Amino acid sequence: MKRYGKLLKQTFRIITTLLVITLVGCSAIVTGDGADKKEIVLDTAGTENTPDIETAEKIEETETEEKPGRVIALSKSNAELWLLAGGSLIATSEDALGLEGVDEDTADLGDMDHVSLEAIAALEPDLLILFSTDPAQKALGEAAEGIGIPVYYTNIDNYADYESVMTDLTKLTGRTDLYETRVADVSEEIEEIIKEVPEGAEEKTYLLLHVSATKSKVEKNDYFASEIFNRLGLRNIAADDSAFDELSLEQIVASDPDYIFVVTRGDEKKALESFDELFKDQPAWESLSAVKNENYYLLSKDLFGLKPNDRWAESYREAFKILYGG
């Protein structure tokens, strides 16, 4: 059998045109250098997520060849995606070391944004999984492809992106059966939860804040958790409001959302101390409708801060309980 990296190079060389996707979410496999450098963009946006025929044929072909067996995924989310697809890892970043399927034989590459090309190359991977939106990982990916290491980029902003990425990865591992249990079944559960939203319920507004020890920011509709609350009948009051680009208590008071949701980043204790000092401890905070009606919630970081992957339905269920009980 041909090795996976060689197969990718041969496949990319015979493709005469690049698929160009202008939709928001996408992932890609990149390999080669110089004149051989090719990037195949895999659609992860839109309502149907119908794969490009050329891309589908390429992935189908890999199923008859040797599957990637020396895979490195940087970040807990990317590592989990590959493991959920039935793959195994030879190395990952330190934040993923606690995942089921990562054992003592899995090399620890440290901080996901400070991994050297030398450390990657020394392990001789046949697939590297990275974020397309992380500048440090994008730079590492470009360097890796330059020495012939195949790179698969992920960018998951919503559930449709998760579906599309898992389609690709389960085809690469040959475990399309896992797509059924970890994507199709999850999709059905999500739809059942959405059906439980009361008909004719008054549309209420919300503000979703990401807070850390050094900064607080408002999440707009391109954040995955915003999609969850939107589909459950709420409206993001900051969706198209540039006034929220710089968060202030005055702007929150002026918009007066029905719900305020907070997700922490980094050290939770320090993040909340900073948030309390800047917002909650101010007299104007008590004037907010969300506060008066006890609709201020600190959300689970695992379900609303990190990409939930196969726990998307759990995130929906938790959000539903907050909004409608049950």
What positions do the PLM features span?
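Structured C-terminal subdomain patch of bacterial secreted/periplasmic proteins
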Residues: 161-180, 184, 264-326
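Alpha-helical, coiled-coil/dimerization segments enriched in small aliphatic residues
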Residues: 95-99, 217-244
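Sec-dependent N-terminal signal peptides of Gram-positive bacterial secreted proteins and lipoproteins
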Residues: 2-33
